Amino acid sequence: MASKSGSLYAIPMDLGGFEFTTFAKTSIDSEVTGTQKYKSSWDFLLLLSIYKIVFNELQITEIDEVNEVVFMLDKMGFSLDSGFKADVTKLSKLKIGTSIVQFDAEFEKEFNLQPRTYLERISILNEKMLKVLCDVELNDRQISLIIDGFDDILRYKKNKMDIVASLIRSADYINNALMMKKKKIKILLLVREDLIAMVVDPDLNKIIHDGAISLSWSNRLDDLKELVNLRFKLSGVREKDLNACWKNMFPNKIKNKNSWEYALDHTLYKPRDILQFLNYCKEEYPQKEKLTISEMQNVLKAYSNRYFIEEMKNELSGFIDDDLIVSIPSIFRRLGGRAFSLSEINKLSNEQCTKKNITIDDTKMLLMYLFEAGYIGQLVSSGKDVKRSVIFKYRNPTARIDYYQQFITHQGLHRGLGVRLLK
């Protein structure tokens, strides 16, 4: 669904449920790896998506060049009314040659050329589509194509990094081409940092370094509170009552902290976390206007069990063996909220996963992803001082893991695991 604000058209494109197995058939050559393997296929899908926005959302239907491209695509079998999944299926059929006759007939008519390969077909078509976009007049309107839902690719074992790398390369290529022509069209990719870290390509490193923005709320907690207030406003709370809304809903103090800080301690400082907590408040106590301390803690237990623990498992999917992921809640439950070492969690992992041997390297990888995602913290001692501090990545984005230190689980996991909360 498009979101329009003034002259800006923000269009979400969710890759959740994307047919990666089908898309994998569209590689230009089985011998090619890295960013070029799927770039041409991504170029086509992204350009086709932009044409759908230009034609269907902005309703630019009176420019001959645009109409010619739209008509040509329709004749080739790619309708602007079709969904993303259908486009991927048609593209894969084109690659393997099952729908090539109709496409080639229109291609020869348009370009006066008989194509020999999939790459030739799609590259020439992409060039035509991009050239027309670079010349179209948007009348000060802006388009943002926002691509999210990359998590599903982690479940796809083969070529997943080539697919991600090619998408990043494609978005960068199209963005640069449109920017050079001063067109206010931008493709935005919302990608987890741990997924980006898996892409090993020197050229992509420069693209990511120059064009990536890291989203962190660790130093923007006031903005996070404003976002929550916006949610209250959308729920019907009057503007003048927004600042007092949280205080009116929750206890003033819990364990020497105000209730806002107490709730944040059970999150990773992500908007989604705190909004999910509010959803569970409504779900658990739909008739209550203000929760007691006991009721708020009951909500945190439901939030931890049904959301926070599941989010942790989802974040590990595709990086860590599935059997080990399933065992993690049991491993953490046995730890009981206390500090643990690399060797101890390796021992517990092998006790829980009896069907396979979990090596120290496997355990290091598990700890690294848990630490990077914020679900475990590092206990650090300074000199001879007995008092230790806890470092979490989501609070300190520059933190680096040290496997020789002890670790501790995030407080947001404890209630769902049924372990004693640390004081």
Report the location of each language-model feature.
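The catalytic "switch" region of P-loop NTPases
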Residues: 123-256
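Amphipathic alpha-helical surface "interface" segments used
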Residues: 62-85, 244-258, 388-393
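P-loop NTPase nucleotide-binding core
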Residues: 2-143, 153, 158, 358-361, ...
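C-terminal leucine-rich, beta-strand-based interaction scaffolds used for sensing/assembly
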Residues: 15, 181, 250, 254-423
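Short beta-alpha junction loops
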Residues: 16-19, 191-195, 382
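Short, hydrophobic, well-ordered secondary-structure elements
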Residues: 43-48, 144, 165-168, 188-191, ...
